[in-house]
Amino acid sequence: MTLIALGINHNTASLDVREKVAFSSTQIESALRAAIAGAGLSEVAILSTCNRTELYAYGSSQANSLIQWLAEYKQVNVAELEQSHYLYTASEAASHMMKVASGLDSLVLGEPQILGQMKSAYAVAREAGVLGGHLHDVFQRVFSVAKRVRSETAIGENPVSVAYAAVSLAQQIFSDLKQDTALLIGAGETIELVARHLAEQGIKKLIVANRTLGNARSLAEQFGAEAILLADIPEHLHRADIVISSTASQLPLLGKGAVEQALKRRRHKPMFMVDIAVPRDIEAQVGDLADVYLYTVDDLKEVIDENMRSRQQAAKIAEEIIVEGLLHYEREQRALTSVDTIKALRQTMDALREQELEKSRKALEAGADPAQVLEQLARSLTNKFLHTPSTQLKQAGADGEQDMLRTVRTLFSLPSANESKSEKE
């Protein structure tokens, strides 16, 4: 049984592959139970974002069986996963989780959202009843390390994120956003960040579209924006110079036909679109239209690279914190290996004690002198407790196993052999 981290991310897999194995928030709980039943795991958690899908597990499962389970569950070609996955076990898995939670493995170095997403993965697994003591301990150490990275380094400073990159790209297309209208589809954390960055750049008009009007209004009110339903997008799409979408929809929300109609009403004035969602919210064919500039999360990488240089030095410090955290984790894991031995020792000693106590009770019931019974009990306990260790130590001495002899002296705080000789002299 060991800790396992299996996944794909923006470095190992294309957007096409990532969206095939992405899990929506409503799918994760049932997937967790299916993984326990079908992949030979005793504990499991799933992290699924626009840039990665990862399984954190504790069990005896092999890489091939885990990949096979994921391929079958998501109904994808197993060869695609075999070519694009990564797998870590034991300490390497813990180290990877620490890097992910700290933002060191993100598309945007140091991006803060990933820690909240990992905490959500932990909470969902715990609620589903598939998170045991092993994964719980790992996650707590991971969260502790990530918190230190945030508080002790500047890795979270400077507004660099997918949301910021999307707005930066919009500024490159439209030099002055004060004359433009932006349609934001979704109402989650990423869209909220997009709205904040656009507002800071003085965007003329913001429209927020969501499946529920209440959620759209909740976000819109923060920025003086207009709120609409997803179903109303076709009526308002022509107003938007900028469209940025990030929802959890499993199907595209904007198709080529709807965008063509909007362009006609705009008299083919160009539209800038960024699809941050995985799976995609905007059909890929929309990018074929002459007056549309469509970008996906993969296209944002160049923009992000330009804005992350200031975090490189902080990342080096973060790596040192992670190494320190990993050492603590490994020490804790080594300590756990002694638990079974200590438990077995106590059980053995308890059994011997009960045997001798029973003999003493019977002697007292037969009228024996209590003082003699106590003396016999103490002598018997000493002999019983030390009989097997003494036999083993004699054999160790005969075999020249000095390490065992030194270990026993350390365990019982006995004087060294030289000290014992000095005392006799």
From Swiss-Prot:
PROSITE patterns, per the entry: GLUTR (PS00747)
Additional remark text: During catalysis, the active site Cys acts as a nucleophile attacking the alpha-carbonyl group of tRNA-bound glutamate with the formation of a thioester intermediate between enzyme and glutamate, and the concomitant release of tRNA(Glu). The thioester intermediate is finally reduced by direct hydride transfer from NADPH, to form the product GSA.
Protein's name according to its UniProt entry: Glutamyl-tRNA reductase
MF GO annotations: glutamyl-tRNA reductase activity; NADP binding
Protein purpose: Catalyzes the NADPH-dependent reduction of glutamyl-tRNA(Glu) to glutamate 1-semialdehyde (GSA).
InterPro entries, alphabetized: 4pyrrol_synth_GluRdtase, 4pyrrol_synth_GluRdtase_dimer, 4pyrrol_synth_GluRdtase_N, GluRdtase_CS, GluRdtase_dimer_dom_sf, GluRdtase_N_sf, NAD(P)-bd_dom_sf, Shikm_DH/Glu-tRNA_Rdtase
Quaternary data: Homodimer.
Binding residue positions for substrate: T49, C50, N51, R52, S106, E111, P112, Q113, Q117
Positions with a binding annotation for NADP(+): G186, A187, G188, E189, T190, I191
Top-level taxon of the source organism: Bacteria
Site label Important for activity, positions: H96
Catalytic reaction list: (S)-4-amino-5-oxopentanoate + tRNA(Glu) + NADP(+) = L-glutamyl-tRNA(Glu) + NADPH + H(+)
